[in-house]
Amino acid sequence: MNFETVIGLEVHVELNTNSKIFSPSSAHFGQEQNANTNVIDWSFPGVLPVMNKGVVDAGIKAALALNMDIHQNMHFDRKNYFYPDNPKAYQISQFDEPIGYNGWIEIELEDGTRKKIRIERAHLEEDAGKNTHGTDGYSYVDLNRQGVPLIEIVSEADMRSPEEAYAYLTALKEIIQYTGISDVKMEEGSMRVDANISLRPYGQEEFGTKAELKNLNSFNNVRKGLIHEEKRQAQVLRSGGQIQQETRRFDETTGETILMRVKEGSSDYRYFPEPDLPLFDISDEWIDQVRLELPEFPQERRAKYVSSFGLSSYDASQLTATKATSDFFEKAVAIGGDAKQVSNWLQGEVAQFLNSESKSIEEIGLTPENLVEMISLIADGTISSKIAKKVFVHLAKNGGSAEEFVKKAGLVQISDPEVLIPIIHQVFADNEAAVIDFKSGKRNADKAFTGYLMKATKGQANPQVALKLLAQELAKLKEE
């Protein structure tokens, strides 16, 4: 029997506000344990939460970006559970009226077609703290993360393969990143994914029993975990077994999912309205104001890059993968850069440098201005493409003017025949054996002189001019 895979994803996104959702403590990542806390985070008796308006702004922005309806009479609820990293013994979240609902985004499938994935809801909530277990037998609680604002985005179970899940996460991350409400860095915990997967016989409308996958710390691991779970469930069903509702974690080493716990039913968190926070009236004017702040999104930019700049769909997708790169490209083209040349550099040398240095394009010295300046120096023959790579590395590390560095470093390309011809003659004099081979008609003997000439000029000879002059002087040499 063949089975259809059914996947839904729950994505927690940490919002990049300066302060926490209900307290004035800093929400910044990477501080000393419990440095970003105050009496509200520690839940001292008598303290009350105060709503951070910036979090609501971010929630509205996310809802609009994900084509969602907005609950304009919004409220919060208490989600009751006990855990050491949750000092209140409840989490302030949203239950029956999330800020956003009934949304969708489009993903691109492997065959180039597009598919709409529905989004059930997006709700605001506070993050919990973090437990660490020491080698001394004690467990320690760090409440820096307690109260950091989150938006949880819950998809409908519309994905039918691990690849579709991967495409959905990629598209969702791009959209959220473009809004500016989060840096969506999984390695820092600002984007976390739980996956729900079940199988059902083709043609059956009712969902099968699902398993929830956790410990998915990268998009690749989401895909790998789903692939393994898909195979595991199919094997169980084909052997006559039944799938239990359970939570499993993905083991990165083995590539397998491992049982954490069996769920006997839905967790009862005894939700009830948060009594310490008022209802929030999100007016049409408020929504319209946030709408004005929305950027041009990746899909719109890709279409523009293909139609207006003549780039391929692949190039357009690569350039819009991050807003920073896309903004860089647009500014470079706006100041006169050739779109294809700028695209080639951003996808080639620039991308390699960023990967090797583990940096983003905003963190290096390269700017749209000095990249366009460098490309112009290549176009007018001032420097060769080979020399340009050296210039690029300098600009990336130090910034500044491309033209000034080229002049200061003596990297200007040699194009003057009166300079090149004496160098060619010296190459002949320094390589008598190669001259003898060439005169005797040895096959490909002329090719060696190209390397000798470039070495003699330290790569600064203009290739087109140099090769033409070299052919001319070799012809004379043969006649001697």
Swiss-Prot record:
SUPFAM superfamilies documented for this protein: GatB/YqeY motif, Glutamine synthetase/guanido kinase
- Kindly state a single biological-process term from the GO annotations of this entry: glutaminyl-tRNAGln biosynthesis via transamidation
Q: Which reaction does it catalyse?
A: L-glutamyl-tRNA(Gln) + L-glutamine + ATP + H2O = L-glutaminyl-tRNA(Gln) + L-glutamate + ADP + phosphate + H(+); L-aspartyl-tRNA(Asn) + L-glutamine + ATP + H2O = L-asparaginyl-tRNA(Asn) + L-glutamate + ADP + phosphate + 2 H(+)
**Pfam families from the xrefs?**
GatB_N (PF02934), GatB_Yqey (PF02637)
Q: What does this protein do?
A: Allows the formation of correctly charged Asn-tRNA(Asn) or Gln-tRNA(Gln) through the transamidation of misacylated Asp-tRNA(Asn) or Glu-tRNA(Gln) in organisms which lack either or both of asparaginyl-tRNA or glutaminyl-tRNA synthetases. The reaction takes place in the presence of glutamine and ATP through an activated phospho-Asp-tRNA(Asn) or phospho-Glu-tRNA(Gln).
Which NCBIfam families does the UniProt record give? Answer: gatB, PRK05477.1-1, PRK05477.1-2, PRK05477.1-4
Name of the protein described by the UniProt record = Aspartyl/glutamyl-tRNA(Asn/Gln) amidotransferase subunit B
| Organism field | Streptococcus agalactiae serotype III (strain NEM316)
**Gene (name only):** gatB
